[in-house]
């Protein structure tokens, strides 16, 4: 199927993918006077008297803003807010179709972190949560961290944490397949940008102790003096053996390779230098860091990619619909590390011992159990950590 042609036809014929659907009928004078003036003034008065009643009388409790400035859209780069709108519409569709969460795409003409922060704070009263999307690094770090501190609704940068949660879920099961433990394995991550950094943080939360991050200049280590602040931080908290060099040196004896970088950077020969029963997650799209057959030829036992035409697809849609559903259901103030880890285990545990195998470490995108399992786990973790208001 020619997906490019099909996508153009879909978007043109429907004039986009989302619209507004009224929940109430306005067919009589009484309907009009109830839905709008004068009747509408009464819920306004109630909310004025008790601002929390906005959740009772409006759509806020199940409505997420999908916010982007279009500076890092898919593999297209900085294409601007207008060109990024089809992606944000798509995100809204997935939130609704998979999680039952209403969402509205908002593409803003704002490049600096300060402008994006100001825009999100200005619209926050309308929404129960904010999904940040396709905002370039390093600005995305400051934007998310600031909004998390200053807003009382959950803010979630899916490019970072959605990827990290699903990778963690997949690795939990991959390690179960090969009989290794998170705290014992040597992990190499290639590409410590927004997603890569979040993956490292998530794996550390899950118990990983030996992670080496590798960028285009080589391994990150204490005193590596990177021009990017988050990489200097990674150099301080990872690479306990202070391995220096490039990907070749980092991979010697490694148990796990995680790539969020560029096509073809991992070779069969490099895979052969890894530990027995190696695990490779090659998630560059559309062409991964190494193709599955090449990795298997190098002795890799468990392989995952971001593609739907290979086994073990690492797909964010397994995470964000259920995560927002769960967070909104308890009116969470935040999405914290414990909620993210709960989501990862909820996804992983859907694959039973009997079903788990080298080519089945993560549920499929259309598994109907996923969103509710994630929502339940996230809601409980929110209660356990004191960020739930219900």
What name fits each language-model region?
Residues 158-159, 178, 282-390:
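Adenosine-phosphate binding glycine-rich loop
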Residues 55-60, 96-97, 122-124, 148-149, ...:
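Solvent-exposed alpha-helices and their adjacent loops that cap or buttress functional pockets
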Residues 74, 79-99, 151, 157, ...:
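Glycine-rich phosphate/diphosphate-binding loop of Rossmann-like nucleotide-binding domains
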Residues 105, 131-134, 155-158, 189, ...:
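General beta-strand structural signal in soluble alpha/beta enzymes
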Residues 232-301, 307-309:
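Rossmann-like adenosine-cofactor binding region
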Residues 69-71, 79, 108-109, 134-137, ...:
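Short, ordered loop/turn segments at secondary-structure junctions
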